[in-house]
Amino acid sequence: MFYLVTMCIPEKYSKECVKMMEESASKGFPISCIAGRDRYDCIERVGRKEADIVAVDPEDMYLAAKNKLAEKAGYNIIEQVRTKEEPDAIYRYEAVAVIHKDLDINNVQGLKGLKSCHTGVGRNVGYKIPITKLTAMGVLTDINNPEYSARENELRALSTLFDKGCLVGTWSPDPAINQRLKETYNNMCALCEKPNVCDYPDIYSGYEGALRCLAHNGGDVAWTKVIYVKRFFGLPVGVTPAVPTSENPADFRYFCPDGSKVPIDTDTKPCTWAARPWQGYMTNGADANNAEAIQRELTQLGQLGENEKANWWEDLLLLNEKTLAVAAPPVSPEEHLQSAKYMDVIERNSGAPERDARWCVWDKNALNKCRSLARAAFSRDARPRFDCILEKDETACLKAVRDNGADITVIDGGSVKRAINEYNAKPIVAETYGQGSTKFSERPALAVIKSGSSINGLGDFKNKLSCHSGYVGDFAGYYAPAFTLKLNSLIKEPSEIDTFFSKSCAPGAPLDSKSCQLCVGINTGDDQTKEATKCKPTNAEYYNGGKGALRCLKDGKGDVAFLPLTALQQLDNEKDAAGKLEDYVLVCPNGGQAPINEWERCNLGLEPPRIIVSSAGKSPNALEELKHGILAASTLYSKNPDLLHLFGAWGDKPNVLFKDDVKELISIDSTWDKWNSWADIQRDYGSH
């Protein structure tokens, strides 16, 4: 039976999706695909039966199992991504504790005072699993002390339980906090190759490194996974035969959660603490016939991708040369996780009372995004858990933070001075935009023309064609040129910018206005799609954003482009189709042209970033915990936007929660002193 399978894929892989459809169709088993915003959105779409299948990690399965992402969704895992080395293994890997055979220990309480070797902080078998299981057994104690952040409570507990250890990695995404934690709990770095660094690369870190630490650096117990134990001791692994090694497995034992010891050999089953389930393909309520047809086509698709060495094979199917898709009896995501004893590892927290970071917003779209972030980040171990609160406006949120009805809110940089003075706010985290922004994350707004243009001052813009990075709400594309033209008496009111130019493309403007006439909509597709996406303030509009405004200028649609410096400094000639840096010069507000690198004397104003504020009444530890949770989520999703599109347009809405061009979030320290000048910018430019 043939069944046309529709796969949902994150938008970032749209091109691979088209390629996959073409290649599968040419082989006689066409697979269709639709683009979701990210994997989270795809899980919702499969739940609503807009698509049949989505490729997922165990953490995504948790989202499907635990959050009502779609009414009446009957999610099932119908294929698993397994390794060719162990195609019959039930789990991707199993977590074990390994000890010296003659270690005097007969229960988990005996771990007290031992020297412990870990893969690395925040990792599964070397950190999350032992912490989760040892806490449940009452071995790790005082792990929910309200004086400390969730991460510090874990590190304190490990540091107290073990005499020494090696636990490398980034203990906090904030460098100052990272340093303090490593100094405070330095016994957990003592067994590392470089105790004073306690970070990768380190020969005693990772799965094999933990065993090396046990065998050769004085460790008593190593937390690692079965496959690496087998490799370390030269035992056969799946289809790979035994190999000679200088390590002797007879000198070591698996240490079991019940306190017993098990030999490390080819005949004895290891005792495990938990397992990480395989990744897989998740469908929604596929009946037996459909499930079989889908499995058959996915297996064919995996083979085709491998033969073609296609990009889509890796990005869309989560496969590589070491893995393959294996059909498995359909199982609910919850069962898939529980059979591996992995559910509590994902849900790991430091016990009651649970502390949520309550995030205040005043817009329905921001609430939707905040809730998605809260669910997704929790499944991927960002702590504290976020909770989202809707108030009527910025002032109400600042009051809520002041009065302990909320913990954090995101405000414009220009509002921080008022927030500090009137609501006892404390700025803790800022947006950052990468190359082309200042030390304090400001983005210079520029008027850009082509090299060789005869335009020599603001007055020359009258009745010209203009390209804007955005409309109302956009600093470089709207507020900065409007303010500058008004300051120079070329317009009386900012709204007159719409008629000052003869035609423009300012995505987000009313569709029937002059400000949309130069916009073109999506770059591919039919006229109907182009029309539907024209002048939208999202990447569907080819001329949207800073790089879009440059494309509009390069294509000869406009005479001038208003955009932030970041768009120029981050120009990728191949990818952006927006020309080269040397193709452009600046027009200065005081007249004349200037090269791009003289932007400091030739800009239309500096745009402040958005800032996350909390309450100055909170303890340093409470503020540190909030920073940790926010930065952990930012680090994760700035690197993996396919999991959750935290930075960029949210649906068809721009600048929801954060500005679209954010690269990641950074910690604010005492050197930040821009609040007064930013308040002046907000007042003068009307950019609020």
Question: How would you name each of these model-derived features?
Answer:
Residues M1-A51, V56-E59, V81-R92, L103, ...:
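N-terminal hydrophobic or amphipathic helices and topogenic motifs
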Residues D41-I43, G209-C213, A396-A400, G548-C552:
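Short, hydrophobic alpha-helical packing/hinge segments within bilobed ligand-binding/sensory domains
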Residues I43, L63-K66, N106-V108, N124-I129, ...:
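Extracytoplasmic/secreted cell-surface and envelope-processing proteins
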Residues D60-L63, D102-I105, V121-V125, I227-R231, ...:
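Solvent-exposed loop/turn segments at secondary-structure junctions
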Residues L63-E86, F232-P270, R418-G436, Q570-R601:
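Ligand-binding "clamshell"
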Residues I77-L158, E431-A506:
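A conserved helix-loop-strand patch within extracytoplasmic ligand-binding domains
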